[in-house]
């Protein structure tokens, strides 16, 4: 059976044509799926015979909510979803003045091994399907009662390590007959799988590419991000430059401030050099505490000094607002906690 929620309208139309059904039915079905229906019987403008025929050929992906945590501080919501095979992923809904943002996962686990991240503990289990990523958006919207206006692929997993499925998810969530979320309202985060940068640039998508840099030199970056081995910061910055030249889209450098690791004035000066070269925005991230990791966030004094150096160098810099600190909102924390409890 085929996963119909992972199909675009033209693909549904082609399948319907083989069943002797008119093309316009594809749009109806796609719109029903975008509303989050879980069975063909809910598609009330289709005949019973067609609904039965669809049930024999296709399945509709579903999620089951295992946990929901709501921050008493800022209303951030964290969901833990169970997938059809029993695995679990996390999704976070964040409320801003400009709208509601959902942070989705792209993989079950992660193999990139970043030393400060909870998502990599336990490694990669599997890639998420396009329909499962779409479900993260649809189910979060339904359960929270909040219309989602922005998507960030910054949850569990490395999106570029699941390239084809992520590209199809983007086509689905961007489709005007579906969620219709514009590409300019979508950010994709990567730890730097530079072999995929040119492929992404060739798609000419208007999304924001956020590069999880976290250190401006090989010595520091290789210690905390194994993905740097065999690539290197120089090659990563070169890839960013090519991406910027090809797309005209400004890149964001994500930079978790880690006490005594990557927060010295020398780090700030080198980061400024890289950012100026590719016209990148720098987003500094106060490090989230992870029980299994020994790292601590930079002190407020070090953070302020770091910002001053970047600003004096002419770099556009912001500090990420810390949301959901009381609900395990750092990606991977809730999933691991529940998995440990089950074990």
Please provide the spans of the model-predicted regions.
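Canonical Radical SAM [4Fe-4S] cluster-binding loop centered on the CxxxCxxC motif
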Residues: 95-132
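Helix-turn-helix/homeodomain-like alpha-helical modules used for DNA recognition
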Residues: 79-105
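Conserved alpha-helical substructure of the radical SAM core
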Residues: 120-150
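Auxiliary Fe-S-binding modules of radical SAM enzymes
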Residues: 1-89, 241-250, 255-343
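Short linear Ser/Thr-Pro motifs
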Residues: 71, 105-106, 119, 189, ...
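Conserved AdoMet/S-adenosylmethionine-binding subsite of the radical SAM
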Residues: 141-150, 155-313, 317
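A generic beta-sheet turn/junction motif
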Residues: 72, 84, 95-97, 192, ...
